[in-house]
């Protein structure tokens, strides 16, 4: 992975859990990567992805910040986590931001509760790396390909 690549880390507005995102930001910055944390407007948009306006907010955030790797954290209800994450991935694929020849987003990570991580790993056949909490700094960086 090249140091010019940009990591965008997201969570929903209702999820107050920030320790994992804060740790990832510190680790990535220590390795000289640029990290963008989603502002409140993007966090709110992630909660309402069925809205075209919310979709545009997220796509604009990714494009304007030239984000190559996206991390999503959701440590509340596992079913909600899978639904929100699924809508995000579907949007990124539909708009050719992910898993297409012209895609700028090379990888997506998910951090959440074990049941949500299990379902996401099953649904995406290992294409999405997950974090369940408690990973060492070395494990975190290794999962992120660093």
Model-assigned labels for residue ranges:
Residues 36-124:
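Cofactor-cradling patches in redox/metallo enzymes
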Residues 135-146:
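C-terminal helix of von Willebrand factor
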Residues 14-21:
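Glycine- and acidic-residue-enriched helix-capping/strand-helix junction motifs
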Residues 1-4, 103:
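Short, flexible coil/linker segments at domain boundaries that flank nucleotide/cofactor-interacting
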Residues 23-37:
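Short helix-loop-beta junction
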Residues 127-137:
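Short acidic-hydrophobic, aromatic-tinged amphipathic segments that line or gate anion-handling sites
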Residues 124-127, 146:
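Conserved catalytic or regulatory cores that recognize and/or transform ribose-phosphate-containing ligands
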Residues 5-8, 108:
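Conserved hydrophobic helix-helix packing surfaces used for dimerization/oligomerization
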